[in-house]
Amino acid sequence: MLDLTKTQDAHIDQRLRSDVMIWLNSVRADGRPHSAAVWFLWDGSAFLIFSQPNTQKIRNLRQNTNVLLALDDTKNGSDVIQVEGKAELLEGNNEVSATLPAFVEKYGAMIKNMGSKPEDMAADYSQAIRITPTKFVGL
């Protein structure tokens, strides 16, 4: 979906690979929006996010899979990146956890600074979410 030969798309891809927080926006059953800052992995085609299983965002995604992801602005409004997508809750997939090498590489120092270990994070944040982009917006 991103054309890395285009400067703007390459910039979006670079930010998605290097930024450590992204805002996951979902919709509650009553139609009200919900926003949560989350850690994430971007592999070039989909996002992988881990959550505690009984959170508002998981309840939202069980009834509506439409999401909007947003990267924080870094240049006073000129570098906002939004991604519309469809979320899938990965149920019972023991192979996907916060102990993934790519996740530990990206967040290992932060996990350690929190006084935790990847295995503990994987146990606490056991619900994996895969988000497949449907539209990218770089402003």
Task: For each feature predicted by the language model, list its residue ranges.
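Extreme N-terminal tail/first-helix region
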Residues: M1-M21, G77, N113
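A short beta-turn/loop motif at secondary-structure boundaries
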Residues: D30-R32, K75-G77, E119-A123
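A generic structural signal for alpha-helix starts
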Residues: T55-Q56, N94
